[in-house]
């Protein structure tokens, strides 16, 4: 059985303690669930959501109920830290492939502003190494010889792409408004990013570091989710799918180098399905740090022209548990604009040194 993506939505993304501070994770997720399930409420098999910094409980079930889905629709919440939202999509697709169901809403929701935790979780035993993510980015830059100028070059490109995507209305079609909130917080002010990036000072290794606030993503609040169906079910409902799930790969690397984790996952994914980076038209790789994209480009031989073509987290921010679902949401809309594309990949790395990658065939 084939799993396909037939719809995708996200909220705006807001800075931590910014526009979306009053919203709990379920407040962010419920409007998306409501939008994706319209006229299909009683056919949804389950809601699966990723979340990394929440209050516990079962966010997916809570959000499904808040969205008004029937009491019979269960929910499951996944924590793979930054990979949570992408894992939710992977899990839904795998359930369909296994014949366990025919329709899922899968994604993630995060409110760092409402998190009850003042300290981050541990990702690895101290004996192995459990660096903060910024320090891990510095370790990765040093190990793979990624210079400050390489990181800044990509950061500027990503900011420009995001601004252009906003100005051209591409982000607007992704977004479900939260009341009157329908514009990402990043675009409410104009910043001279071309001047800010080269002037920014290292923040994690102040003596000789290369990772700055300007070539790193900001912590954000937001949600994203997709309507995942069995392909024949979508056809029976008269819905046109855009992406067909082909397969996935998950891998672990040394926890000191999590920004490099997508490299191993993507390499494994492509090898399993006998394709090369040249065969892939679009890559969405989470921009927690510019060094992550630079490493993926360098180690896999992927030109920047194929990666995050409408920008990403460097401008919009990184709502941990939602970011992976936002990657697939962006692929969904970009694939609709590029009917000549054949394959697309979404990938993310997370704390503890875990990489996750999904391969899709473009059907648009």
UniProtKB/Swiss-Prot annotation:
Entry coiled-coil feature ranges: none
Induction of synthesis: Repressed by presence of biotin, under control of BirA. Probably part of the bioY-yhfST operon.
Record-level GO BP terms: fatty acid beta-oxidation; phenylacetate catabolic process
Active site: 82 (acyl-thioester intermediate), 318 (proton acceptor)
Keywords recorded for this protein, A-Z: Acyltransferase, Transferase
A single MF term (Gene Ontology): acetyl-CoA C-acyltransferase activity
PANTHER family, sorted: 3-KETOACYL-COA THIOLASE, PEROXISOMAL, ACETYL-COA C-ACETYLTRANSFERASE YHFS-RELATED
Family note: Belongs to the thiolase-like superfamily. Thiolase family.
Name of the protein in its database record: Putative acetyl-CoA C-acetyltransferase YhfS
Native species: Bacillus subtilis (strain 168)
Gene that encodes it: yhfS
